[in-house]
Every structure is written in structure tokens, then in C-alpha cells.
Amino acid sequence: MLREGARLGWALRPNSPKLKNFLNTFLQDNREGTLFGNIIRNRYIRDFDWAENAAGAEELTRYRALSALFRKYGTDYGMDPTLLAAQGFQESRLDQSVRSHVGAVGVMQLLPSTAEDKNVGIPNIDELAPNIEAGAKYMAFLKARYFSGPELEGINGSLLALASYNAGPGRIRRLRREAGERGYDPNQWFDNVEVIVAEQVGRETVQYVSNIFKYYLTYRWINSADAERAAARRATGIEDAP
């Protein structure tokens, strides 16, 4: 149990005793008051509005309607489809009709000039599928060009690419170097490079990446719940409609 009276819970199938025991042990070892437990509480649990925003009925319908496109283009360009979907939610609430005051277009809020750049080269971003493809390809370009290498383990290369999508790759590369010079880990976004970015750029980019990561966690929970539900239906001989 993370806390009593919470608005968000974690449901398990009753025939998953190993998973239940693992989670109970993890929560006991990382309860509030421990270092990791406090980090988790302060970053993700204290305020659940972000999860409710991404997991509302209308938002879930939109997410599920676009999931196949994010899977396709995430796979095509070597990016995590769930992270791309979370980015799309942050940019536009997954709404292709959105246009910004500076001319950014659609789900991924790309400028036409970015989509036309030789490193992207995807036309027709007024249409849904090309818009998501262009966003995925641009993210893949940022990550491969500026934030790849064995030192960037796990999701950190993608988080730095997200920061660059918002604030520009040249600026984030410079601030990453400054983070290393000032004793922070230049290969870790959270609590390291983000500190320097907040100081030098302001909270907008830090909040942008933080929001996307929270939506990413929400979508991962949704994906897991959907997979569990589908498995249970198959086990009982109930097939989902095509």
C-alpha cells in the first residue's frame, strides 16, 4: 500500500501470487521515509492529476485509436512507441486539429519547416499519420545525432532528445557539458542535467520532460492492464471482436 484514501490504485489478478509478493516486498523496502520511497512519492504519487488527465475516458479513447500509428512509426524509427504517444499527449492531447500560435501542427506539434528539413522530409503533416511519422523520425534524428552511445543507458538518451525537441539540441548539448563540469552526471536527465536546464533555461523544458515521463508511466500501466485483460479473456475462451 502506497497510502490510504488514494484516488489511484493498482489492481492485480487474484491468480498472480508471485507478482503480488514481489510488489509487496518492493513497497515495504521502498516505503515513504526511505530515500527511493520519498523520491517516488514526491515525483509521482503526491499529486495524481497528471495520471487522471491522461487516463480519462475521452483521452483513453483517443490514445487507443492512435496506438497502432505510434507502434508502427516508433518501431520503424527505433523509438519507444509509448514514449512517443506520451509526447503527443503533452504536445496536443493527441488532437490532430490543434494548431499553435507559431504554426506548429497536429498531434506532435511540428513546425512545417521541421518536417521539411532534409533530416525529416515527411510531407503532409496536416494529416494524422504523416504527422506522427514526422515526429517519430525527428525524435530518432535528435537521439541518434546528439544523444546516442553506451554511456546513455536506458531511457536517458530519449529524455535528452525530448528536452532538445522542446529547447533545441545545441542548447541541451551545451548544458549537458556544463552539468558534467559542475559535478552532475551528464548522462542522467533526472536530478542531474535537468537541474542545469532549469537554472539556465527555466522550468518549461524541465516540466515538459517530466510531464511526458509521467504520461509514459500512465500509458505503460494502461498497456499492462489491457494485456492482462486480453490474456484473461483468452484463457476463458472469450475472444475480442476484430
Language-model segments: what does each one mean?
Residues 45-94, 129-132, 146-150:
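Export/targeting segments at the very N-terminus of extracytoplasmic proteins
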Residues 24-62, 228-237:
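Ligand-binding clefts/hinges and TM-proximal coupling segments of bilobed small-molecule sensing domains
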Residues 2-12, 18-22, 156-225:
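Catalytic and substrate-binding regions of cell-wall glycan-acting enzymes that process beta-1,4-linked
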Residues 239-242:
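Short, solvent-exposed mixed-charge patches
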Residues 8-13, 53-60, 71-73, 95-98, ...:
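Second-shell loop/turn segments in exported
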Residues 97-123, 130-141, 186-188, 212:
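Substrate-binding/active-site groove segments that recognize
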Residues 80-86, 105, 155-163:
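Alpha-helical scaffolds flanking conserved acidic
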Residues 24, 28-32, 45, 49, ...:
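Sec-exported extracytoplasmic/periplasmic mature domains
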